[in-house]
Every structure is written in C-alpha cells, then in structure tokens.
C-alpha cells in the first residue's frame, strides 16, 4: 500500500512520545468518526484552485464537521484502573493515549448505559464489519485515532502485531482533578479587544491589586503568589528550601531585608510581564472534547443530534458557578476571528451523560468553533475560557474563517 512518507514517519514517531505504559483494555472496538452537516456564514479561504488563496465571504455555506476528530471513549472502569496504574487517586475525565499508529484523547463516558437506555441494543459493528457486544468493550477508538486502521484486517490483527513489535498502550497526559480558578491572559488574547480606558483599568485592576498587596507586606498574598494558589495552611513544608519556605515557617520573615529584596526583584519581573499582557482573570485552561453523545449515536447507527445546541458548550466548572456565557481562546491566536463566545449548557441530560467529564470543555457538533479556534481538534488541544465581563465586552462579532486545503492520502 502506498503512503505519503512524511505522514508515515509522523505516525511511526508516535511511539516515541514521552508516556507511561498502562495495561491493555479488556475489549477494544474501532468505529468510524461521526460527521455532521450544517450551514453557516463564513470567511472562506480557498487554497485548492490556485497558488494564491482566494478569500470570499460565503453566506449559508455548507460545512461538514468531524465532530469527534481525535477522540474516543473509555468506560469508567477502565478510567479508574488506568488512573490507579499511574498513581492517581481520582477518576479522570480523560487521558491522552498512545500505541502503534494510535493517538488521541479517550474520555470517560458510560457508553454501556447509552446502549441500554438509548440504543436499546448491545450490538455494534466495527470498521471492518465485525460485530461486538458493547458490554465486552472498555475502549472505543475512532478511525481518526487509529491512523492506519485500514492496513489491518481486524482489531485482533492490530493488537497482535502491536504486541509482537513491543508496542503497548501508554498515557502521555491525564486530565486534572480540578481546574484553576485564575488564569493569565497574553497579548494575543488581548490585542484585538475593543476596550475603553475605564475597561482597560478595570481589566488590569486585580493584577495591580495583587502586586500592591505583595509590596505592602500582605503575608498570605505573597505566599500565594510565590508558591501557588493551591497553597493552604495544612500544606506540608517541602523543597525547595528557600526564603519562601522560611516565610511558611515564620511570617515575620517577610520583614527580613534579604527576603523582601528577593520578593521585590520577583515583582519587578512580574510587572514586566504585565506590560506584555500577562494579566490575571477568572478562568482556566481545559482540554477540548467534541460531543461524545454524537459518537455513541453514530456507532449505534442512530440519527446524530448530540446533546449540545449550536452556540453551546458544556463545562461543569462554569455551570457549577452559575455562569451563563464565556469567552474562549486557543493559542496560537492570529486574528480576532479566533475568539469564540459560547453559552453554557445546563440541563438534566447533559448533567447525566457528561457527569464524568467534569474538567473538560465539550464543544457542540453544529457550529464552526473548531475552525474559529484555528483548526482545533480533540486529541489533546486546550482552550482558555473566562467569564471576565470586560473581556466579553471587548469582543466584537466576526465570521469564522474556514480554510480549504488539499488533503494528501495516507
């Protein structure tokens, strides 16, 4: 079979990813990626017809979206076992996996409950046409994850050849147990916002207040800044044993000339960062996911609708705080069109089916959010979200940029 050399070398190098080996799942199935079709007004960049891309505004443009590009599903039982194997004591929302010619995120989702309650069948058919009982499956892979799936005759053929060549499943990343409450912006995220002078002042005020508190001998704010927001009174004193450790033992060390000089030098660097746009906002980075409900619908041959509507995302973090709307950014960002503003879904259905995905951001399958976020997919990409009122106020409506590019074969 013919391959594009560059792609083949990239697939081969997946085995070199820094990762932690884990046990093989007890039952694996490979299914096709779901696809949705919708219509949207877009800025179309067509690079297929000439050397110089043609840019046009297209009304009601037909978009075909691979709504689960780069993601698969793992059962809660597998998530628990893998977490224990990498010495984590919580149930992760997802893990980034590797194996021979295989990469992507596996998110924790109860697809067996879906089979019982929604599909009302235990049988699914894989990409090779073989039937499987979903109750015997722990890991669902998609064709976008298993790059050379059509070079094998079955999942057993793939696993057997992987084992014989020394390959195994491994994890490169695991989702956090909790998301941060505060995140820093950067110049890319800020430079295109339309802000009045008062808005700019209010946007940077929390950062200025933090610096002012530290310079004015606020012991707790200083320790939080130096050692991180997760520091508590019960935190065990541990390395590095430096002036910050001394402050944790005795808060009066803040009055020591050497200690205070170290803090001032640190703050000078922080002030330089602020000038470059590194300012604090309420928000965090989280891993992106497509709508796993669409994948379940697709693999059981049901109409693909998903649970999220156009313009919606699911985020337990924001939903649990009563937030209705957030702005989303993905680095690298190049233009204002790369910013999304989304509504937070909150209903019984999403809360039930996404209950294990509490630290990820789930995109809907019915808009161009992936294109807007500079070609995001779901194999480990992250999004920074914030509910900051001045950031939201400074975002102006723009059309998504959709780029048409030629795709080479495998």
List the model feature ranges, each with a label:
Residues 1-371, 392-393, 410:
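Conserved small-residue
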Residues 367, 373-410:
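Conserved catalytic alpha/beta cores of large enzymes that bind or transform nucleotide phosphates
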């Amino acid at each position: 079979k013919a391959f594009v050399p560059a792609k083949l070398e990239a697939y081969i190098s997946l085995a070199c990813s820094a990762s932690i080996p884990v046990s093989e799942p007890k039952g694996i199935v490979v299914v096709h990626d779901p696809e949705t079709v919708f219509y949207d007004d877009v800025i179309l960049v067509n690079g297929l017809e000439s050397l110089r891309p043609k840019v046009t505004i297209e009304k009601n443009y037909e978009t075909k979206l691979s709504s689960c590009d780069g993601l698969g599903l793992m059962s809660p039982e597998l998530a628990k076992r893998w977490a224990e194997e990498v010495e984590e004591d919580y149930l992760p929302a997802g893990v980034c996996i590797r194996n021979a010619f295989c990469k992507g995120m596996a998110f924790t989702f109860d697809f067996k409950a879906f089979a019982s309650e929604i599909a009302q069948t235990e049988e699914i058919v894989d990409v090779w046409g073989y039937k499987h009982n979903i109750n015997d499956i722990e890991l669902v892979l998609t064709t976008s994850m298993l790059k050379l799936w059509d070079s094998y005759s079955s999942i057993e053929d793939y696993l057997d050849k992987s084992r014989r060549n020394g390959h195994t499943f491994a994890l490169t990343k695991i989702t956090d147990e909790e998301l941060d409450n505060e995140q820093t912006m950067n110049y890319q995220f800020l430079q295109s916002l339309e802000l009045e002078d008062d808005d700019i002042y209010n946007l940077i005020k929390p950062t200025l207040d933090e610096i002012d508190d530290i310079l004015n001998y606020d012991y707790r704010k200083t320790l939080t800044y130096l050692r991180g927001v997760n520091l508590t009174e019960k935190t065990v004193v541990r390395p590095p044993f430096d002036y910050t450790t001394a402050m944790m033992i005795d808060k009066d060390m803040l009055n020591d000339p050497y200690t205070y000089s170290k803090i001032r030098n640190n703050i000078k660097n922080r002030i330089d960062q602020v000038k470059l746009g590194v300012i604090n906002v309420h928000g965090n980075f989280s891993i992106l996911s497509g709508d796993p409900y669409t994948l379940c619908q697709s693999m059981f041959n049901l109409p693909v609708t998903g649970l999220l509507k156009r313009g919606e995302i699911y985020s337990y973090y924001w939903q649990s705080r009563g937030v209705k709307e957030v702005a989303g950014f993905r680095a690298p960002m190049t233009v204002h069109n790369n910013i999304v503003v989304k509504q937070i879904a909150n209903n019984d259905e999403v809360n039930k089916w996404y209950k294990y995905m509490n630290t990820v951001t789930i995109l809907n399958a019915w808009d161009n959010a992936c294109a807007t976020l500079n070609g995001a997919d779901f194999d480990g990409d992250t999004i920074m979200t914030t509910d900051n009122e001045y950031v939201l106020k400074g975002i102006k409506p723009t059309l998504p940029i959709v780029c048409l590019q030629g795709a080479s074969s495998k």
